[in-house]
Amino acid sequence: AAGRVLMTVEAEAEIDFNSETVVTTENIYTLDMLGVENAYEKLREEKKSDDIKFYCVGYSVKHYYQNGYVITNLEGHKCNKISCELIATFLPDEVVDGLYAAVERAGLYVANLTLEPIAAINVAIPERFRLLNIALVDVGAGTSDISITKDGSIVAYGMIPSAGDEITECLAKHYLTDFNEADALKCKSTEMDEVEFSDIMGLPYKVSSEEIAEVVKDTVYSITKSVADKIIELNGGKSVSAVFVVGGGGKIKGFVESLAEFLELPKERVALRGSEVMGNITFMQDDIKVDSLLVTPVGICLNFYEQRNNFIFVNINDERIKLYD
């Protein structure tokens, strides 16, 4: 649900020093926060309201500048001025409150808040690949999240409200099953040649994965067409050089091939990413299957150690106040 109301804003920020100064980590963090603040003000201007209540749930720096020249890492360099260009993403206050409330009702607490495309791209597309014009598509249940890299940085985020649940609904209607049975059917079809199930009348069926792929073909075409159109829009009106697909929805047969067709790319330039990008991740369970389903969860875990995008709660006069950390 969060992705459907996500707002993305590009902004700039700069810091002028009184004299030549060695840039510290604190200077860089201050610069980033100035950029986020400028993005927030820009969002308020676009919404034409001073009462806007949006929270920044993540940001990515596109470029840092030292005295006006692009630089990868500012820390330790001497200069008179530092600046940055970044992309900040915001969610409405009520959406963030809803996410926290749902977690708290389960008896848990939120340790970190991030966006799925930010988490996934940090695993699936390492910085050494970001000079290339690549798209990452995280095909989840309700949304397909998209991010674009070019010239060494992440240059755009986007989403479409179409993903794996539409495929599940298609199967449920065709085979007359409930949603959970259809979802299990969808998942099994990506790993087995034949799948057994029962419809709501109790009648047993055994169907091939090829038949299932044929049933959902039109739905897959519709989703991949929307994804391709969004990628082209985010990339300035042209296709990218390659696409990495993660998430469960992208595992359905025909998905990556259809996406390649709509983007006019060779089939080998659109591929699922799984174990190939998690070679340096050690899992405690020996029998865990390392595939595209794990890319985003692993990215979320890594983000917890690397970022500070979360909220803290304090009680003042018996009233709980939420603060952005």
Language model features by range: what are they?
Residues 1-2, 127-156, 171:
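Gly/Thr-rich phosphate-binding beta-strand-loop-beta motif of the actin/hexokinase/Hsp70
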Residues 1-4, 242-250, 273-275:
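Glycine-rich beta-strand-to-loop/alpha-helix junction loops that act as flexible
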Residues 2-134, 191-198, 206-213, 234, ...:
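Nucleotide/phosphate-binding catalytic cleft detector across ATP-hydrolyzing
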Residues 57, 88, 93-97, 101, ...:
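Phosphate-binding glycine-rich/basic clefts of nucleotide- and phosphate-handling proteins
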Residues 140-142, 262-280:
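Acidic-glycine-rich active-site phosphate/pyrophosphate-binding loop
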Residues 271-324:
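Glycine-rich phosphate-binding/hydrolytic loop that grips phosphoryl groups
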